[in-house]
């Protein structure tokens, strides 16, 4: 019934596209007048558009003419004229939606339309892609169009200086990778002045390969971290013990990707831990004193039994490097968190790096939701349309192809074993190779690609392997995969973003030559050779794409198919499967095995059965739904941290921009003074219950105030009077510092102290949240909702952090002095300039710079409280104690350590 209605009325997508086609005539109506403009007049259109916007016009008012201008500029500069369907894609992107466009339909060119239009507001446009190569390529090729029209173009890649990044981000249009954007956002919020920041306020982002970034990478947060305690030896010891466990000692669930010790396993590992002296005899792994070891054991179990070398990670130059499960690329600089990376290093017997503590983190889900306007392009996203709508409020519109798709998608072939499957794949590859038909073989891991490569080597079939180990060459290899007799093996979607042209890519081949006197002749020769080769490839049937396994996601399978049949080219695709494949084994093996037994399948015989196809599709849908729930759950938890992150980052920016840091100090001083006084002199309490002695100690500890007991001996003194007095005394201390050092220098010092304190407590708070998050799922066993519990406890931790911030900030401000002796006769204003300079230098990008203590503000800020000879301390006068180490006996004579007595609140 539904299919009949769709035929009668069309789908919602059909109706949207039909409506958009009616707008194309408006763009085309400008073409005759724009075509006759000179280059200078065409460029001047940018000035005209900006003037119109300043006079009240909207972007939609100038959309049709602006798109016509970009089309004409592209035609003149690059020799490429936007097709009507590409104009539709541009409108979709401008309106904050996702354009699904098939491979080879020119998504890069489409992005120039909304990028140019939105750049006219002078607020910046980010064109986001998945790797440095694509960012550089697209900024260079499309930048010619923008420059021709008078707009500036920047490109952000790894390893750039802050100054270079600042220039690139201040360009009208900036090409960048999602990773660099995320890290720059975190780094900016660790800087100490607005001038040091590189990013502008968020405006509009166009994400290429949007499904890869917003879906595939959504579960992986980007993290800036710093080292914590060295526990490498313990990881090594636990690794050796876990190797001795039996299969019966643990249970693993491959569907849920979990692993747990059995009762027998707990007993076994406890005996091994006792034998190695790691835990005491007669204690258990889950005893309170040994609970920290559970974390190490669990990560070692995961490393050995849930993670596979050359599938999930590889070892290169003595380092464990993560492989992106979706692209097959090495994720440079990324490390698994929570000790898993250290467990893998112990497993592979390479140097174990220190665990890291999170300094700043954000998921791509929450990073990209910062943009007021967001759009994206991809070849396959309709299968995830509901997720993109639910999480990002992005509608997906499938754009029709310019040429009809002539590719033939053959039915899957299913075999009983992996060997039978490989035999069938080899037979097909031989047939295609002998006829000259190019073949692209897609695998799901490096291990599988190298396994297949080994088979082809034995058969002496020349081929190229494209995987994470050779990602530097991937664009060139994939671009030439359409040549006559080419055989290419690729992991998943490695090389994504680079078109496979039948006969080869002439531009990339031409780039291999130096521009010598034979350059023009060589160029013509290569183009002629490619044209001839293309015709031969078309005669063989075009590119044949072979899938060696079904991926968990239908979308990834569709992306592999989409490598063939670009722009109306001929091509074929087919998947070869076996019951040994991970997806079949985990999700569909029992049902399909039953069908095969019923049908009496013989060795080496393939089967095509509708039930098997349905079972596979159901298995993929099941995994997709599970992964979607995982991402949704991650977002629910990350939203809690994101709300707190926004508050901290906004507050930090406000502090940096502030020209009066004394305002922050005054409000914090008043609030803390009231709190301290009320702690020792509760409202409505009797005078004899007032704890003046400890109030005196606390006021000195926090404010450096020498409080006179006699001030409260008057009968008419109230706690309110004492609070006012404390605030006034604190104010006087600050003013005396201002007189000594100048108000300008004090302003900078207070601002610096506030920012460093904020950074410290925020870092500690993230550490607490990490630990809270790790164990929160256990609350479900107590019939409590883990998310509700996480929200409640995270809020309590946040309040506690803010209280700690105020106290540490106040304590530091009132207990420091600035050492100006080294200045000799230099002016205070010069000291202020030096202080500002050192403040900048002391807090450069923590990901790249080496901290230079000699250039930090700590050179100038020194605590007033100094050590005092113990014999000069009076037990009943804390003022005489000076600085006391926390582990010293308390000078009061109680016999307790200072940290458990008068120092309990420090």
UniProtKB/Swiss-Prot annotation:
Q: Where does it mainly reside? A: membrane
Q: Which UniProt keywords apply?
A: ATP-binding, Cell inner membrane, Cell membrane, Cytoplasm, Membrane, Metal-binding, Nucleotide-binding, Protein transport, Translocase, Translocation, Transport, Zinc
Residues binding Zn(2+) are 890, 892, 901-902
**Biological process GO terms, please?**
intracellular protein transmembrane transport; protein import; protein targeting; protein transport by the Sec complex
One Pfam family per UniProt? SecA_SW
Gene Ontology cellular-component annotations: cell envelope Sec protein transport complex; cytosol; plasma membrane
Which cofactor names does the annotation list? Answer: Zn(2+)
* Catalytic activity from the UniProt record: ATP + H2O + cellular proteinSide 1 = ADP + phosphate + cellular proteinSide 2
Role according to the record? Part of the Sec protein translocase complex. Interacts with the SecYEG preprotein conducting channel. Has a central role in coupling the hydrolysis of ATP to the transfer of proteins into and across the cell membrane, serving both as a receptor for the preprotein-SecB complex and as an ATP-driven molecular motor driving the stepwise translocation of polypeptide chains across the membrane.
The topology of this chain with respect to the membrane is: Peripheral membrane protein
What does the subunit comment say? Monomer and homodimer. Part of the essential Sec protein translocation apparatus which comprises SecA, SecYEG and auxiliary proteins SecDF-YajC and YidC.
Chain positions recorded as ATP binding sites: 86, 104-108, 499
Return the SMART domains for the record.
SecA_DEAD (SM00957), SecA_PP_bind (SM00958)
SUPFAM superfamilies per UniProt: Helical scaffold and wing domains of SecA (SSF81886), P-loop containing nucleoside triphosphate hydrolases (SSF52540), Pre-protein crosslinking domain of SecA (SSF81767)
Q: What's the EC number here?
A: 7.4.2.8
Give the top-rank taxon of the lineage listed in the UniProt record for this protein: Bacteria
- Which InterPro entries does the record match to this protein? Helicase_ATP-bd, Helicase_C-like, P-loop_NTPase, SEC_C_motif, SecA, SecA_CS, SecA_DEAD, SecA_motor_DEAD
Q: What protein is this chain from? A: Protein translocase subunit SecA
Query: GO molecular function of the protein, one example?
Result: ATP binding
The similarity comment for this entry is:
Belongs to the SecA family.
- Indicate where this protein resides in the cell: Cell inner membrane; Cytoplasm
The record's cofactor note says: May bind 1 zinc ion per subunit.
């Amino acid at each position: 019934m539904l299919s009949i209605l769709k035929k009668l009325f069309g789908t919602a997508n059909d109706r949207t596209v039909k409506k958009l086609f009616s707008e194309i005539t408006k763009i085309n109506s400008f073409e005759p007048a724009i075509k006759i403009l000179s280059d200078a007049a065409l460029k001047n259109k940018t000035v005209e558009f900006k003037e119109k916007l300043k006079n009240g016009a909207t972007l939609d008012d100038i959309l049709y003419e602006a798109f016509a201008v970009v089309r004409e500029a592209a035609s003149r500069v690059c020799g490429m004229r936007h097709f009507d369907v590409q104009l539709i894609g541009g409108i979709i992107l401008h309106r904050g939606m996702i354009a699904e466009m098939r491979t080879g339909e020119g998504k890069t060119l489409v992005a120039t339309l909304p990028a140019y239009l939105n750049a006219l507001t002078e607020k910046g446009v980010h064109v986001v892609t998945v790797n440095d190569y694509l960012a550089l390529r697209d900024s260079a090729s499309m930048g010619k169009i923008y420059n021709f029209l008078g707009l500036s173009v920047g490109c952000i890649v790894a390893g750039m200086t802050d100054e270079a990044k600042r220039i690139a981000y201040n360009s009208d249009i900036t090409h960048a990778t999602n990773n660099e954007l995320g890290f720059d956002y975190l780094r900016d919020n660790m800087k100490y002045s607005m001038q040091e920041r590189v990013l502008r306020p968020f405006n509009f982002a166009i994400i290429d390969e949007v499904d890869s970034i917003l879906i595939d990478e959504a579960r992986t947060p980007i993290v800036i971290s710093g080292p914590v305690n060295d526990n490498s030896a313990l990881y090594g010891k636990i690794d050796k013990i876990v190797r001795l466990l039996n299969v019966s000692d643990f249970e693993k669930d491959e569907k849920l990707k979990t692993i747990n010790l059995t009762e027998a396993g707990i007993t076994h590992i406890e005996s091994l831990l006792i034998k190695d002296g790691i835990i005491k005899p007669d204690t258990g792994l889950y005893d309170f004193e040994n609970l920290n070891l559970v974390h190490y054991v669990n990560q070692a179990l995961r490393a050995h039994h849930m993670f596979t070398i050359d599938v999930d990670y590889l070892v290169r130059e003595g380092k464990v490097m993560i492989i992106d499960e979706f692209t097959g690329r090495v994720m440079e600089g990324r490390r698994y968190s929570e000790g898993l990376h250290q467990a893998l290093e112990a497993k592979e017997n390479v140097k174990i790096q220190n665990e890291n503590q999170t300094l700043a983190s954000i998921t791509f889900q929450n990073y990209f939701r910062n943009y007021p306007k967001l759009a994206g392009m991809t070849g396959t996203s309709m299968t995830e349309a509901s997720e993109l709508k639910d999480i990002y409020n992005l509608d997906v519109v499938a754009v029709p192809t310019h040429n009809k798709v002539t590719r033939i998608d053959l039915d899957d072939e299913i075999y009983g074993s992996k060997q039978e499957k490989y035999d069938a794949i080899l037979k097909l590859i031989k047939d295609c190779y002998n006829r000259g038909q190019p073949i692209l073989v897609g695998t799901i891991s490096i291990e599988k690609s190298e396994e297949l490569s080994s088979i082809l080597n034995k058969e002496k079939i020349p081929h190229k392997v494209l995987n994470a180990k050779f990602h530097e060459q991937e664009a060139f290899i994939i671009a030439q995969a359409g040549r006559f007799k080419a055989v290419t093996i690729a992991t998943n979607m490695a090389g994504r973003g680079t078109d496979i042209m039948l006969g080869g890519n002439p531009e990339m081949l031409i780039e291999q030559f130096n521009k010598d006197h034979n350059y023009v002749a060589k160029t013509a020769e290569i183009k002629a050779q490619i044209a001839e080769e293309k015709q031969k490839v078309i005669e063989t049937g075009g590119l044949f794409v072979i899938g060696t396994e079904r991926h968990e996601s239908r979308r990834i399978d569709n992306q592999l198919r989409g490598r063939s049949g670009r722009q109306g080219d001929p091509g074929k695709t087919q998947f070869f499967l076996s019951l040994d494949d991970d997806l079949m084994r985990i999700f569909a093996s029992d049902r399909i095995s039953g069908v095969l037994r019923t049908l009496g399948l013989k060795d080496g015989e393939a089967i095509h059965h509708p039930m098997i196809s349905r079972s596979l599709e159901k298995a993929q849908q099941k995994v997709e739904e599970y992964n979607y729930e995982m991402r949704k759950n991650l977002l629910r938890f990350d939203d809690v941290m994101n709300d707190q992150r926004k508050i901290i980052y906004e507050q930090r920016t406000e502090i940096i921009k502030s020209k009066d840091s004394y305002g922050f100090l005054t409000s914090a001083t008043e609030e803390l003074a009231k709190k301290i006084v009320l702690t020792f002199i509760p409202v409505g309490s009797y005078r004899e219950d007032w704890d003046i002695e400890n109030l005196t100690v606390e006021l000195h500890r926090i404010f450096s105030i020498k409080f006179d007991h006699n001030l409260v001996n008057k009968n008419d003194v109230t706690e309110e009077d004492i609070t006012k007095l404390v605030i006034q005394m604190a104010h006087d201390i600050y003013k005396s510092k201002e007189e000594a050092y100048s108000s300008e220098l004090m302003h900078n010092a207070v601002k610096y102290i506030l920012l460093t304190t904020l950074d410290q407590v925020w870092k500690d708070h993230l550490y607490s949240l990490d630990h809270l998050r790790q164990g929160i799922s256990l609350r479900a066993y107590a019939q409590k909702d883990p998310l509700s519990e996480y929200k409640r406890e995270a809020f309590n931790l946040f309040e506690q952090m803010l209280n700690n911030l105020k106290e540490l900030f106040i304590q530091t401000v009132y207990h420091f002095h600035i050492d100006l002796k080294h200045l000799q006769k230099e002016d205070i204003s010069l000291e202020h300039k030096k202080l500002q300079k050192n403040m900048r230098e002391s807090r450069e990008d923590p990901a790249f710079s080496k901290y230079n203590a000699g250039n930090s503000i700590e050179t100038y800020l020194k605590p007033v409280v100094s050590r005092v000879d113990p014999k000069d301390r009076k037990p009943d006068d804390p003022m005489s104690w000076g600085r006391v180490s926390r582990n010293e006996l308390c000078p009061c004579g109680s016999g307790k350590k200072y940290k458990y007595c008068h120092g309990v609140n420090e």
